[in-house]
From Swiss-Prot:
Zn(2+) 2 binds at D108, E143, H361. Catalyzes the hydrolysis of N-succinyl-L,L-diaminopimelic acid (SDAP), forming succinate and LL-2,6-diaminopimelate (DAP), an intermediate involved in the bacterial biosynthesis of lysine and meso-diaminopimelic acid, an essential component of bacterial cell walls. The lineage of its organism: Bacteria, Pseudomonadati, Pseudomonadota, Alphaproteobacteria, Hyphomicrobiales. Its EC number is 3.5.1.18. This is Succinyl-diaminopimelate desuccinylase. Pathway: Amino-acid biosynthesis; L-lysine biosynthesis via DAP pathway; LL-2,6-diaminopimelate from (S)-tetrahydrodipicolinate (succinylase route): step 3/3. Pfam families: M20_dimer (PF07687), Peptidase_M20 (PF01546). It catalyses: N-succinyl-(2S,6S)-2,6-diaminopimelate + H2O = (2S,6S)-2,6-diaminopimelate + succinate. The active site is at D77, E142 (proton acceptor). Gene3D superfamilies: Zn peptidases. It comes from Methylocella silvestris (strain DSM 15510 / CIP 108128 / LMG 27833 / NCIMB 13906 / BL2).
Length: 388
């Protein structure tokens, strides 16, 4: 194992031993900051607060004072492990067996943080900070509500005068094998609630009541009857998914007074949240007028807009580094859920590339040692090419 690979693997194992379940940091960022300071980075621990959520620790680190500026973004917080007894090893033990590292966050995304940290520290040790600037933008609030995390950290950095040319976000983008996918954008996400009012009554006397459920079903059918669009060159078609239908009625002999459905829409760059809301309101109003139903359609505030980073020389550079190390030409994709790239996009072009995501958030989350080693080599190649 090379020195670079050894450093990446040991950093990963140490990070995994810090049980940083959102909103706790458990020393993960302090450990990372100490390692980066030893390598010549200036570090800043920044805590953000909001009256409705717990305080969150964030980390910003930088080496270099000028030239091109490449920032790596990531998160040290992880989802809960669930029943630890279901795991092969302690989910916060950083254990290795059979060429695999086990632990909550191995894939999402302490492995990628460790790989980039190893590459960046080696690059700086070889005088790389004279060629440009490398920074880390690390939050502890990605798996949670994302209120005191990357969005605020970016604003904090910008107010300090930090300007980024490009960003790599270390999300586990690969589907089957390391090198098969780069995320160049993300779909937007919009949450909505449809409520239909009725008149409560006894089921034996339906003429004295008005059941809201059939009206709700008709309205939901109207919302989903026609596709929202056919997709674009870089995006799949937008999709509305009904996620719950509730009436709050535990009995068999009462017609409920109200029925409510919740839904989520993953939308492409054809739409803005306002345009999408207007389209769905028009569909609901048309169907509601025909059915004679009193309904209300409410949309939650949206901070996840659809976006795409147009392929360019930076995309080519990252793709070439991946293909050189893995022999795979990565697919450029906008699939999947939202990520903190939705915040970063407002400051600089952002690409997402990390480990294989097949075990993220699962029992026995694990990453192959060879993948972490290869990822560190890919990141090192990116740094060398970027600052050439």
């Amino acid at each position: 194992m090379s020195d670079l690979a050894h450093t990446a693997v040991e950093l990963c194992r140490e990070l995994l031993r810090r049980p940083s379940v959102t909103p706790l940091d458990a020393g993960a960022q302090d450990f990372l900051a100490a390692k980066l300071r030893e390598a010549g980075f200036a570090t800043h621990s920044v805590v953000f607060s909001d009256e409705s959520t717990p305080d969150i620790q964030n980390l910003y680190a930088r080496a270099g004072a000028g030239g091109r500026h490449l920032v790596f973004a990531g998160h040290t917080d992880v989802v809960p492990p669930g029943d630890s007894a279901s795991w092969r090893f302690d989910p916060f033990g950083g254990e290795m067996e059979g060429g695999l590292i086990f632990g909550r966050g191995a894939v999402d995304m302490k492995g990628a943080i460790a790989a980039f940290a190893a590459a960046a520290m080696a690059f700086v040790a070889e005088g790389g900070a004279q060629k440009g600037s490398i920074s880390f933008l690390i939050t502890g609030d990605e798996e949670g509500p994302a209120i005191n995390g990357t969005d605020k950290l970016l604003r904090w950095a910008h107010q300090r005068g930090e300007r980024f040319d490009h960003c790599i976000l270390g999300e586990p983008t690969n589907q089957q094998a390391l090198g098969d996918m780069i995320k160049i954008g993300r779909r937007g996400s919009l949450n909505g609630t449809l409520t239909v009012k009725g008149v409560q009554g006894h089921v034996a006397y339906p003429h004295r009541a008005k059941n809201p459920i059939p009206h709700l079903m008709r309205l939901l059918a109207a919302l989903t009857a026609e596709p929202l669009d056919q997709g674009t060159e870089l995006f799949d078609a937008s999709n509305l998914e009904i996620v719950s239908v509730d009436v709050g009625n535990p009995t068999f002999n009462v017609i409920p007074a109200e029925a409510r459905a919740r839904f989520n829409i993953r939308f492409n760059d054809i739409w803005t949240p306002d345009a999408l809301a207007a389209e769905l309101r028009a569909r609901a109003e048309k169907a509601g007028a025909a059915a004679g139903a009193a309904s209300a359609l409410h949309f939650e505030p949206c901070n996840a807009l659809a976006f795409v980073t147009q392929p360019d020389a930076f995309t080519d550079l990252v793709s070439a580094a991946i293909e050189q190390a893995t022999g795979r030409k990565p697919k450029l994709s906008t699939s999947g859920g939202t990520s903190d790239a939705r915040f970063i996009r407002a400051y600089c072009p952002v690409l997402e590339f990390g480990l294989v995501g097949s075990t993220m958030h699962a029992v026995d989350e694990r990453a192959p040692v060879e993948d972490i080693s290869a990822l560190a080599s890919i990141y090192a190649d990116i740094l060398n090419s970027y600052f050439k």
